[in-house]
From Swiss-Prot:
<feature type="active site" description="Proton acceptor">
    <location>
        <position position="43"/>
    </location>
</feature>
<feature type="binding site">
    <location>
        <position position="218"/>
    </location>
    <ligand>
        <name>Mg(2+) 1</name>
    </ligand>
</feature>
<dbReference type="InterPro" id="IPR013520">
    <property type="entry name" value="Exonuclease_RNaseT/DNA_pol3"/>
</dbReference>
<comment type="similarity">
    <text>Belongs to the ERI2 family.</text>
</comment>
<dbReference type="GO" id="GO:0003676">
    <property type="term" value="F:nucleic acid binding"/>
</dbReference>
<feature type="binding site">
    <location>
        <position position="41"/>
    </location>
    <ligand>
        <name>Mg(2+) 2</name>
    </ligand>
</feature>
<feature type="binding site">
    <location>
        <position position="213"/>
    </location>
    <ligand>
        <name>AMP</name>
    </ligand>
</feature>
<dbReference type="GO" id="GO:0000175">
    <property type="term" value="F:3'-5'-RNA exonuclease activity"/>
</dbReference>
<dbReference type="InterPro" id="IPR012337">
    <property type="entry name" value="RNaseH-like_sf"/>
</dbReference>
<keyword id="KW-0540">Nuclease</keyword>
<keyword id="KW-0863">Zinc-finger</keyword>
<dbReference type="InterPro" id="IPR010666">
    <property type="entry name" value="Znf_GRF"/>
</dbReference>
<feature type="domain" description="Exonuclease">
    <location>
        <begin position="37"/>
        <end position="226"/>
    </location>
</feature>
<feature type="binding site">
    <location>
        <position position="41"/>
    </location>
    <ligand>
        <name>Mg(2+) 1</name>
    </ligand>
</feature>
<feature type="binding site">
    <location>
        <position position="597"/>
    </location>
    <ligand>
        <name>Zn(2+)</name>
    </ligand>
</feature>
<keyword id="KW-0862">Zinc</keyword>
<dbReference type="Pfam" id="PF06839">
    <property type="entry name" value="Zn_ribbon_GRF"/>
</dbReference>
Length: 691
C-alpha cells in the first residue's frame, strides 16, 4: 500500500476516475468562459474502394447542448441530409455509420438543413438567453450567457462543412466560424495523444455509450468527455476561427500594405507626369481625358509629401491643373492627344512648344477633345507641361524672334497613324537622320542653334546641328535664330522638301513614332491660316526649344551622281519600316510574353498573394501543376524582374547593319546613299521567334 501511495504521489499511477451512473454529478473546479457548449459531430459520405474522393457530403447533422455548470444535455438536434453529388451511399458508408439509403433519401438538402439548424439555435437563444462570442478571455458577469461550438477535431467545421458550402455556394452561418477542438484541448491538458474518441473516453474512465460513428451518439459522448475535462479543471477556450483577423491587430501587415500602396501611387504619379504614353508610340494609344484628370488627382492627393513637393517644384502640376483656363487664356485649343504624346516630341521637334513670355509658364491642357482634318491629318494642341527652368539664352532668343515669329500657329497638323496608299510621301529611316519628302512651292528654313539644358525627366542630349547647303537669302537674323527664304527652281526632276531631325541618342525614352515626330511636314497643306505673312503685333506663342537644334531646308540635286527624284516615283515604304513599334521594352506596357519553360511549354504568369517580402511580385513558372497526374513539372521558376534584366542584356546587336537603297524605274539611285539601319533602330523579334 505504501508503494502504491508513493507511486500516486510521484504521478507514476493515478487514481481511476469512475464516472457516475447519470454522468452529471460533480461540479466544475474552475470558472468556465462559456456557460453552454454545443457539440457537433457530422457523418459524411465515405468509400473504401481505394480511390481518392475529393468531395464528401454531410449525411447526418447532429448537435447537443451541454450545460457547463451542471453537465446536463439540455437540448438535441438531429437531421439526415440528402447528398446531391453522390446520392447513392456506398456499402462501406452504410456499414460504418449505420445510416440506411432510405434515411438519406427521405432527408433534406444541406441548405434546408442549415435553415432548420438556425431555427433550433434561435430557439435555444431565446430560451437560455445565450449569445455566441469569439475571443473571450474572461468569464462573463452579465445576465447574457456565452456559448461556443465543440467538435472532436477541426474536420467537421473546418473542412467538411466549409468546403461543401463553397462547392454548393451556400451561405454558412457566421457563428459556425469559431469552435473548440476538443482533441487538441485534450492533448494539451492531459499531455498525451488520444487514440480516437473512444480511446480518449477509456483513458479518463468513461465507457462509450451507443453506436460508434453514429452522429448523435458521437456528439453525446463528446459532450461527456468535455464535461469530464471541465470537472478536472480544464478551461474551454476557442482554438480555431475562420474569421479574418482585424487589420488593427496586425500592424506589420498594415504597414506593408500601406508601403505597397504608396509605391504604387508614386509610380502612378511618375508615369502620369512624365508621359503615360511615352512608351506607347502609336497614335492610337490615346488616353481618355477624364482618365487623365483622374490620374492627376491621384498624384495631387498622394500621401507622399516629399514626392508631391518635388513634383510641384519641377513641373507645378497641381497649379496647372486648377488654373489652366484662368492663368493661361491663350491655350484654349482642345485635343485628345495624351500628355505623354505632347511631351515626347519635345525631344525631336520644337514646334510642340510655344513661347509665351519671359516669366510666363506653360501648362497642361487637360480638358481636350479630338478633331480631325481630312483623313490623313490630325489637329492637336501644342500645349505641353510646365517648364520652370528656362535659361537666359533661351529668353533672349525669345525676345529676338518676337517680331518675326509672333503669329506662329497655336495648333499643328500631324499625319495620321498610317497614311493611305496614295499619299505622296516617303519616310526613309537612316542611322543619322529621318527624312520626309513632300511637294512644296516655297518654304521657310529655320535654323535654330539653342543649347540643350539638362533636365531630370528627359536626360542630357547633345546634338550637332546640321548645316544647310541650299541657296538662300537671309530674311531675319538674331544671335541664335536665322530665318532664310528659300526659293526653289521649278525643276521637273525635283519637287521635294525634306524635314531633317538629328538622331535621338537618349536611351531614357523610346523613339517617338515616325508619323508623330514630324508635325511640320504637311505636303501641300499650308501651316499658316493666313499665308506666309505674319502680324508682328500679335502675341508671341512659340516656346523655347528645349531640345537639340534642327534644320528645315530645301534639298536640290547638287551632285552629278545624284539622280533627280520625283515625289510621284517614290513608293510608300512598308509599314514595318515606317513605324517604330515599341519592341525595345515590351514589359513597359504590362504585356510581356511569358518565356518558355524547360519542358517547351509557355510558362504561366503568377503573382505572389501571401503577405511577405515578395507580396505582389510577378513570377513565371511551369504551367503543369505539381499534383497533375501523368504529367511532370519541369520546375521552371523565374521572377519577372530578373527576366526583364536578362532580356535587356540580351538586346545586343543581333541584326547586321546592311545598306538599303530605295529606287524606282524613273530614278537610278539617291545620291548613292544606302540607308543603314543600326541595331538600335532595327526591329526586334518576339523572344519565341529569335534565333
Amino acid at each position: 500500500m505504501a508503494t502504491k501511495r508513493l507511486a500516486r504521489q510521484l504521478g507514476l499511477i493515478r487514481r481511476k476516475s469512475i464516472a457516475p451512473a447519470n454522468g452529471n454529478l460533480g461540479r466544475s473546479k474552475s470558472k468556465q468562459l462559456f456557460d453552454y457548449l454545443i457539440v457537433i459531430d457530422f457523418e459524411s459520405t465515405c468509400w473504401n474502394d481505394g480511390k481518392h474522393h475529393h468531395s464528401q457530403e454531410i449525411i447526418e447533422f447532429p448537435a447537443v447542448l451541454l450545460n457547463t455548470s451542471t453537465g446536463q444535455i439540455d437540448s438535441e438536434f438531429q437531421a439526415y441530409v440528402q447528398p446531391q453529388e453522390h446520392p447513392i451511399l456506398s456499402e462501406f458508408c452504410m456499414e460504418l455509420t449505420g445510416i440506411k439509403q432510405a434515411q438519406v433519401d427521405e432527408g433534406v438538402p444541406l441548405k434546408i438543413c442549415l435553415s432548420q439548424f438556425c431555427k433550433w439555435i434561435h430557439k435555444i437563444q431565446q430560451q437560455k438567453n445565450i449569445i455566441f462570442a469569439t475571443g473571450i478571455s474572461e468569464p462573463s458577469a452579465s445576465e447574457v450567457k456565452l456559448c461556443a461550438f465543440v467538435t472532436w477535431s477541426d474536420w467537421d467545421l473546418g473542412v467538411c462543412l466549409e468546403y461543401e458550402c463553397k462547392r454548393k455556394q451556400l451561405l454558412k452561418p457566421v457563428f459556425l466560424n469559431s469552435w473548440i477542438d476538443l482533441r487538441a484541448t485534450y492533448k494539451l491538458f492531459y499531455r498525451r495523444k488520444p487514440k480516437g474518441l473512444s480511446g480518449a473516453l477509456q483513458e479518463v474512465g468513461i465507457e462509450f455509450s451507443g453506436r460508434e460513428h453514429s452522429g448523435l451518439d458521437d456528439s453525446r459522448n463528446t459532450a461527456l468527455l468535455a464535461w469530464k475535462m471541465i470537472r478536472d479543471g480544464c478551461v474551454m477556450k476557442i482554438t480555431r476561427s475562420l474569421n479574418k483577423v482585424p487589420t488593427k491587430k496586425n500592424f506589420s501587415i498594415l504597414a506593408r500594405n500601406l508601403n505597397t500602396i504608396q509605391v504604387e501611387e508614386m509610380s502612378a504619379c511618375n508615369i502620369s507626369i512624365q508621359g503615360p504614353s511615352i512608351y506607347n508610340k502609336e497614335p492610337k494609344n490615346i488616353i481618355n481625358p477624364h482618365e487623365k484628370v483622374q490620374m492627376k488627382s491621384i498624384c495631387a492627393n498622394s500621401p507622399i509629401k516629399a514626392q508631391q513637393d518635388q513634383l510641384q517644384v519641377k513641373n507645378n502640376i497641381k497649379a496647372s491643373l486648377h488654373n489652366v483656363k484662368s492663368s493661361l487664356p491663350l491655350f484654349n485649343t482642345k485635343s485628345s492627344t495624351s500628355v505623354g504624346q505632347l511631351q515626347s516630341p519635345t525631344l525631336n521637334s520644337p514646334i510642340y512648344m510655344q513661347k509665351q513670355g519671359k516669366n510666363e509658364h506653360l501648362a497642361f491642357n487637360t480638358k481636350s477633345k479630338a478633331s480631325t482634318v481630312g483623313s490623313e491629318l490630325v489637329l492637336v494642341s501644342t500645349t505641353v507641361p510646365t517648364v520652370h527652368h528656362v535659361s537666359d539664352l533661351e529668353m533672349s532668343s525669345t525676345l529676338d524672334c518676337l517680331p518675326v515669329l509672333a503669329d506662329w500657329e497655336d495648333v499643328v497638323l500631324l499625319p495620321a497613324s498610317q497614311p493611305e496608299e496614295n499619299v505622296d510621301c516617303t519616310v526613309p529611316i537612316s542611322d543619322s537622320d529621318l527624312e520626309i519628302s513632300f511637294n512644296s512651292g516655297e518654304r521657310l528654313m529655320v535654323l535654330k542653334e539653342l543649347e540643350m539644358s539638362s533636365h531630370e525627366n528627359f536626360g542630357d542630349i547633345e546634338e550637332t546641328p546640321q548645316k544647310s547647303e541650299t541657296s538662300k537669302s537671309i530674311v531675319y537674323k538674331s544671335p541664335h535664330t536665322t530665318i532664310y527664304n528659300v526659293k526653289e527652281a521649278k525643276d521637273p526632276g525635283s519637287d521635294i522638301s525634306a524635314f531633317k531631325l538629328p538622331e535621338h541618342k537618349s536611351s531614357t525614352f523610346n523613339r517617338v513614332n515616325a508619323n508623330m515626330s514630324h508635325p511640320l511636314v504637311l505636303g501641300k497643306h499650308p501651316l499658316l491660316s493666313g499665308g506666309t505673312k505674319r502680324n508682328p503685333c500679335s502675341p508671341q506663342a512659340f516656346p523655347p526649344a528645349k531640345k537639340q537644334p534642327f534644320t528645315i531646308h530645301e534639298e536640290k540635286p547638287t551632285s552629278s551622281d545624284c539622280s533627280p527624284v520625283r515625289s510621284s516615283s517614290w513608293r510608300r515604304l512598308p509599314s514595318i519600316l515606317t513605324s517604330t513599334v515599341n519592341l525595345q521594352e515590351p514589359w513597359k506596357s504590362g504585356k510581356m510574353t511569358p518565356p518558355l519553360c524547360k519542358c517547351g511549354r509557355r510558362s504561366k504568369r503568377l503573382v505572389v498573394s501571401n503577405n511577405g517580402p515578395n507580396h505582389g511580385k510577378v513570377f513565371y513558372c511551369c504551367p503543369i501543376g505539381k499534383y497533375q497526374e501523368n504529367r511532370k513539372c519541369c520546375g521552371y521558376f523565374k521572377w519577372e524582374q530578373t527576366l526583364q534584366k536578362e532580356r535587356a542584356n540580351s538586346m545586343v546587336p543581333s541584326h547586321s547593319t546592311g545598306g538599303l537603297t530605295f529606287s524606282s524605274p524613273e530614278t537610278s539611285h539617291i545620291c548613292d546613299r544606302n540607308l543603314s539601319i543600326s541595331t538600335k533602330n532595327s526591329l526586334r523579334l518576339r523572344p519565341s521567334m529569335r534565333n
